[in-house]
Every structure is written in C-alpha cells, then in structure tokens.
Amino acid sequence: IQSPLWHEQRYKSAFHKSYNEFPKNSLLEGVLIPEKLKKGKVKLRISYNQFEKKIEGSKYTSKEIKTLQIIESNSINYSLKYKDRKNLDQLFLKRNSCDDIIILKNGLVTDSSYGNLVFFKNEIGYTPEEPLLKGTRRAKLLHEKKLAEQFSKQLGTEICDEWQNRNHSKLLEISKLIKEMK
C-alpha cells in the first residue's frame, strides 16, 4: 500500500470532520489483499461510515493523458473523498474529445477529475494551494519537499491563460505544454 501514513491521516481527519469523533480503528486494519491481486498495481477502495468499513480491490490500469479541457465550476466541493463522484463526473462529461479536465474554481486551478495537479517551472514543482481534495501523494511530496513549499495560486492559472491566449482554446495538449515550459 503506497503512502499508508498519509492515507491514515486523511482518514482520521475526514472521519472527524464527518462524525465529530476520531475513528476507533486504523483505516488499514484488517485489509487483506487477495492473492489474485498481489501481482501488478491494484486499486484499493475502502468505503466507510461511522460503524463499518468495506474493502474492494481491482487491477489498476493507468490511462495516458495527452489532452486536457479547462472547465470552470465555482460551486464544486470535493474536500472529502466520496464514493459518489457525481459532481466530478458531470464536469468530466464536458471534456469534449479530451482525455481529462483541469478544474478552475473561482478563477484558480484546482485539480483534474482524477487527481491533484503539479506544474513544473524551472524544474520546481508547484501544486495549487487550494485543490479540491488534498491528495495523499500530494501531502507526501510536500512533506518530502519534492514540491515547492511556496505555493503559487496564480502559477497554474497563468500557464492556462497564456496557453489559451496563444492558442485561442481551452484545450491543453500536454506534449506541447511540456515542451514550452522547459
């Protein structure tokens, strides 16, 4: 299990925020990976409420992201990781022919539909100060100082605005964007 400490911290925080008490057991207590899922990457989903936990596992397949559509939503709230992703899914449907989306909230870059964003400028990684969800990998990289401690709320917005002004489009082509940022 990748980043167990960070998953545990997010679990405790979310549990407390939802139920006004801390959980009595560890998130990962009782997690057993079936033999058939012990090879390769596995996506582990742990759903819980105040009284019980449900653990599901499936093979993980990553998807290659080549294009991103910029979508604005000032009303979206995903501060806790929910099984119900209806609001994110509705935004994702607006991607046209793109592979994924970049979500702007109140004019600021937040996340993609699937995870946190990192922008590199002069070989320094920046992540939005106010993501929709503070992901576990993001927390780990910030703690390890692999991302800049100084957040730039505007960095992502500047990159997106610059791209849109030059290309007259809200479509970001990742390969071109990466070449131009170097």
Predicted ranges, named:
Residues 1-43, 47-182:
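Helix-start/capping segments and mature chain N-termini
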